[in-house]
Amino acid sequence: MEQTFSVTTAQRLDTFLATLLNLSRVKVAKLIVDGLVSVNGKKITKNGWLVQPEDRVHVNWSEELFEKVPVEVQPYDFPLDILYEDEQIMVVNKPNGLISHPTSFNESESLLGAALFHCNHQPVFLVHRLDRDTSGVIMLAKNQSSLLHLQKQLQQRVMKRYYLALVHFPLDSLSGTISAPLERVGNNKVMWKVGNSSNKAKNAFTKFTVLNQNEKAALIKCELLTGRTHQIRVHLQFIKHPVYNDPLYGLKSEQATEYGQYLHAQQISFIHPTLNKEMGFEAQLDKTFSDKLDNLNLKIANSLYALFQ
């Protein structure tokens, strides 16, 4: 099976492919070293090769490697930042760089695997997911009843999810709603774009509020009104304020680092499935994100909870 991808931002080849293919960098390194990757028709065997905007990256996978097999979640001994836990649910602050759910190449290195290890191999289920390089609040259920209850809240918009996004350039409007349907980019299995009202496009809505901005950048609050793949990242690119360091949807002139996009799931609120009371939790930014805000002189309060009401 062969796939070809277009580069939009300058970055390392292994970082680019790890994001697109949702693989660990160890697995991507093996693909590159084994000679399965070429750039603009030239075989590349160096992981740190820098790809540039408009480069064409071709991956030639073996059929055996692409054989579809069920993915079994393997327990992963990884320290979790648990914000809340009881017999029904877990609320966790997911770190940047950790996938939510295992793929066929990452059976053990996932947040779900870490939760399974923490729960002594007792069943645990993801209520929703976050992209690998998106940090922040993620919720898990410990039984099917709680899972269905919480997923229904997602569908009916009872559950509220708020994100912090660091974007390029100041915004003219300090608040608003982005209404733009999303569809896949051709046959690309990873990237999405704003489409039209065809059958392929899915309605998507994102509310935003500017928290702080200057002549270079803005820190904005985003609320998901729908939950499409890469929704916030594509919507912000669409209004010409792409997320900083986004390897898929960022500025072409920006060389993305391994940290990935500066996007953080800051807060979640929901009705507890058995206690029947409203609960809310907030996840703190990691040091890399906080330092980036300091470097851009975008100060924020120690706690943003009041901003997410």
From Swiss-Prot:
Molecular-function annotations in GO: RNA binding; rRNA pseudouridine synthase activity
Gene Ontology biological process: enzyme-directed rRNA pseudouridine synthesis
Catalytic residues identified in the record: D131
Domain S4 RNA-binding: 11-87
The UniProt record lists the keyword Isomerase: yes
Keyword annotations from UniProtKB, A to Z: Isomerase, RNA-binding
Protein name: Uncharacterized RNA pseudouridine synthase MG209 homolog
Transmembrane portions of the chain: none
PANTHER family per record: MITOCHONDRIAL RNA PSEUDOURIDINE SYNTHASE, RIBOSOMAL LARGE SUBUNIT PSEUDOURIDINE SYNTHASE D
Family: Belongs to the pseudouridine synthase RluA family.
E.C. no: 5.4.99.-
